[in-house]
């Protein structure tokens, strides 16, 4: 399995740039570990296809917010078809269609939609642009490829911004400086929109990171490089949107701005005794305690004023066990929602193992998790202590 390690700088040969750009697009967002079939057009054009699948079997201590009975569920966590490539030496493109969580909770035959669709313009390694719908440039974990995770998956909530979630529509400028040791991202996007918004202003995001060992060149990251790099990266980001909500929704007064910050660190060190991976982050979303206003906006998400942190670690055994490799992992996270009820505040702990039959292209994973709430909600089983067990199969072509 061949992996691209960096995005090439501008005006390398067309062949090198074409191959590098396709690989970079796949690694940045799809989470695909290798390119699928590629069709070339002329001297500079190309189109690459990818199929990525995650099937889960999950046993959970409740069924829904109204049903406290234990549930066993089989569903498609992710089910994506990706199209990516180059129009010419300067302009590239990427799109994927997805039907996530199909069959989860009895919701079968979900409609597919474009999860990502964007154009890239690569002027140089120091100056690149993305236009369309793509990943938010705020938290590291959201930018980590979902098909290259260290744990079973990302955090269920805290890594996604309240206004935009995992993706948003807009434009980003980014680049690598000092031979990739320093990276910057600047993004302007829709953020919160709609009639309930006090003022329709753009959402502005800025992110930087410093790589002290091997550089992380791509717009996105990986949760683990499976021992192919020595990485120590420190990152930080800020997110802002003006006048996103009213604290007095009925009277349409007392507007509040949205502000958020995050800081993170990622470390991976391969040794003869195996590969150690560790990552941690803290994030704070602040919308002026809008839920505590005179008449709060009923459309505000629960994450409006969320603050939290996580730590996660993994160990990849040095040799094969049978036909594949074994990676064990653990995760702890703490989240406080700052809601009047206090019901959602929680601690989340999980341990698990990946059996990598062909790297990330074909693997089986298992995770056992326990969620404990500070305050037990007497009417909502999803906000009471529970345990969860997940078995997953991942395939990428």
Predicted segments, located by residue:
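Outer membrane beta-barrel
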Residues: 36-216, 222-224, 303-319, 325-338, ...
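Bacterial N-terminal signal peptides that target proteins for export
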Residues: 4-20
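N-terminal signal peptide c-region/cleavage motif recognized by signal peptidases
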Residues: 30-31
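Repetitive helical segments and hydrophobic/amphipathic motifs
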Residues: 25-26
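Outer-membrane beta-barrel pore domains
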Residues: 2-3, 42, 61-68, 106-107, ...
